[in-house]
């Protein structure tokens, strides 16, 4: 009888604890979401601060001021200044990629407009960020992270090409290198405002793309 009482008590206790345990798990999950959202906000503010003032011209105080809190608070989110630079660059430049590809044409008739407008738009919107990215990823301290980032870029643009394939009627294996040419020309223009280089690349694309579309219509 005593064993049965112990058993019933343990069942009752377990049922009393379950809601609290679930509530604790939910609270931890929410806290983690809040932490991650704040970290992303900090990464954007720090990256923008670096983009405005340069990698070498920006100290920890300037970063903390941009975020609106103390220098020590930065280390709530990052183990070191190097970690902040590495994580912020990867996060913010992936967002730039998304911004860029959100403007990708979904109709063949829109491709010419895309070629004409987007290089100038991204130079205006993202030029400082591109320059900072190259400053960071060509630095000996960060170059391995740059290699890893650009491997990811290649994979992501391939995925974009797969998404565009049914909309444009061009196989992704053909579309991917065309995207690479266009992105490289756009980024080069954003970095150096080299109009001659940009137009020479766009001329090739504007001649090639209609031929490619016509080929795969058949």
Predicted feature locations:
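Short secondary-structure transition hinges
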Residues: 120-159, 192
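Helix-turn-helix
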Residues: 41, 45, 49-83, 87
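Hydrophobic alpha-helical connector segments
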Residues: 87, 100-125, 172, 176-179, ...
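N-terminal intrinsically disordered/low-complexity leader segments
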Residues: 1-37, 218
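Short, basic, alpha-helical segments at the C-terminal edge of helix-turn-helix-like DNA-binding modules
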Residues: 90-97
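Solvent-exposed, amphipathic alpha-helical segments
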Residues: 41, 45-52, 99, 103, ...
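Amphipathic C-terminal alpha-helical segment
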Residues: 121, 135, 176-199, 210-218
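Amphipathic alpha-helical packing segments from all-alpha helical-bundle domains
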Residues: 97, 141-169, 173-177, 203, ...
